[in-house]
């Protein structure tokens, strides 16, 4: 049996030092102090001390987890990875994840829903890209499939139109055919399916400007003529 002979507060708020039989033994958090009703004069068995130390590791993990998610929402995998960096045992990490979930601070389904909704409001990403990003955050495929399937096609179309209009503004100095090609490629890279891409382009309905198109073709021809300067005139004309 061992007796707690002194408890002192650390400079760090919510942390305490436990002294047993006149000697410093271990630190505890306020949560552990309260849970075990630790007080001067309390007699502890070796088993109880082991339990307290184990609980303290879990409490420390919970504190790290709470601090991590206080800045922004996180997935279970992100919190797990953060705790693993502290070399916490796997069973402790699982206890922390369970506790945070029970407290309502961790909810992967809600995270996926809000992440998708936020991107759909002002974003320009399609379902494939969003799915990839969320899978990297550790969300399960079946969960993502359900969340993405719940989004109406009109919402994806709106996002594709926003992305398409932005892309066209960036390439308005290019020839019409080149604009369309770059537009299709850009929408594919953002994760939209073929049907949504075709509908988005039809909705945007980009039109060629004959006068501007003529000027662009002349500029491109002049550029190619300069680039083919090493060839003879006849071959140069053929290549241009």
Curated annotation (Swiss-Prot):
InterPro entries: RecX_HTH_1st, RecX_HTH_2nd, Regulatory_RecX, WH-like_DNA-bd_sf
Gene3D superfamilies: Winged helix-like DNA-binding domain superfamily/Winged helix DNA-binding domain
Domain of life: Bacteria
Keyword DNA-binding: no
Location(s) in or outside the cell: Cytoplasm
GO biological process, one term: regulation of DNA repair
Keyword annotations from UniProtKB, A to Z: Cytoplasm
Entry keyword annotation includes Cytoplasm: yes
Any GO CC annotation of this UniProt entry: cytoplasm
Pfam families, alphabetized: RecX_HTH1, RecX_HTH2
Function: Modulates RecA activity.
Family designation: Belongs to the RecX family.
Protein name: Regulatory protein RecX
Taxon lineage: Bacteria, Bacillati, Bacillota, Bacilli, Lactobacillales
């Amino acid at each position: 049996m061992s007796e707690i002979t002194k408890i002192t507060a650390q400079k760090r708020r919510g942390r305490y030092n436990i002294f047993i039989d006149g000697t410093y033994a271990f630190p505890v958090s306020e949560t552990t102090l309260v849970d075990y009703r630790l007080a001067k004069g309390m007699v502890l068995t070796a088993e109880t001390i082991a339990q307290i130390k184990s609980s303290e590791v879990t409490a420390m993990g919970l504190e790290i987890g709470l601090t991590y998610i206080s800045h922004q929402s996180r997935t279970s995998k992100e919190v797990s990875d953060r705790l693993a960096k502290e070399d916490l045992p796997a069973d402790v990490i699982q206890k922390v994840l369970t506790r945070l979930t029970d407290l309502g601070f961790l909810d992967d389904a809600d995270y996926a829903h809000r992440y998708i909704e936020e991107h759909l409001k002002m974003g320009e990403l399609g379902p494939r890209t969003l799915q990839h990003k969320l899978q990297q955050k550790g969300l399960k495929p079946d969960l993502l499939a359900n969340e993405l399937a719940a989004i109406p096609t009109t919402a994806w179309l709106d996002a594709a139109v926003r992305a398409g209009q932005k892309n066209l503004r960036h390439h308005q100095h290019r020839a019409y055919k080149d604009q369309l090609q770059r537009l299709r490629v850009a929408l594919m890279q953002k994760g939209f399916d073929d049907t949504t891409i075709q509908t988005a382009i039809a909705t945007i309905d980009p039109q060629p400007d004959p006068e501007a198109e003529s000027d662009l073709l002349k500029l491109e021809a002049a550029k190619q003529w300069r680039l083919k300067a090493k060839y003879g005139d006849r071959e140069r004309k053929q290549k241009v």
